């Protein structure tokens, strides 16, 4: 078992191509969700992207509520890259880090990281929705490593999933 690493951050130079599928899914979903909130893409875009992975429909709700908590409760302006960006932003890395902690049963560390990231009411809301999302993704074998770029068996990765991400990255949603 790895030691506690609540201070861990994804390096600012982390590239999307270095992420495992579960990490890439969350980063792309967050980016598409943010674009939908600004009216630049249809609301259904992020829901379609999530459902392309054959995850339970209830995760739509949990992801949406999680994003609302992160946007409204962030201690600083939200740092999320554009859909076509090849690097991950600070808040994208924070989301991945907390999700990894929850998937690896490190709830206390996840709560500490959320408290440092979000104001307390938003952190509590985000945590409950993240737990549901973490469980749903784990059941679908979409697991985020505790440390980025950790060598994993890429459970859940199929050409269909890869093609979906490629289509998302190359689609008109980038602009």
Put a short name on every predicted segment.
Residues 1-175:
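Polar/charged low-complexity regulatory segments
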């Amino acid at each position: 078992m790895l030691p506690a690493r609540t201070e861990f951050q994804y390096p600012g130079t982390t590239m999307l191509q270095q992420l495992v599928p579960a990490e890439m899914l969350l980063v792309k979903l967050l980016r598409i969700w943010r674009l939908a909130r600004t009216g630049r893409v249809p609301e259904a875009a992020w829901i379609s992207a999530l459902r392309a992975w054959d995850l339970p429909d209830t995760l739509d709700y949990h992801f949406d509520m999680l994003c609302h908590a992160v946007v409204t409760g962030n201690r600083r302006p939200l740092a999320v890259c554009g859909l076509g960006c090849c690097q991950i932003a600070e808040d994208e890395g924070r989301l991945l880090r907390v999700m990894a902690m929850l998937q690896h049963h490190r709830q206390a560390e996840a709560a500490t990281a959320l408290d440092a990231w979000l104001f307390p009411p938003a952190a509590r809301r985000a945590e409950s929705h993240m737990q549901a999302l973490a469980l749903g993704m784990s059941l679908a074998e979409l697991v985020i490593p505790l440390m980025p770029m950790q060598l994993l068996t890429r459970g859940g990765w199929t050409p269909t999933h890869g093609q979906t991400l490629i289509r998302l990255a190359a689609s008109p949603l980038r602009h």
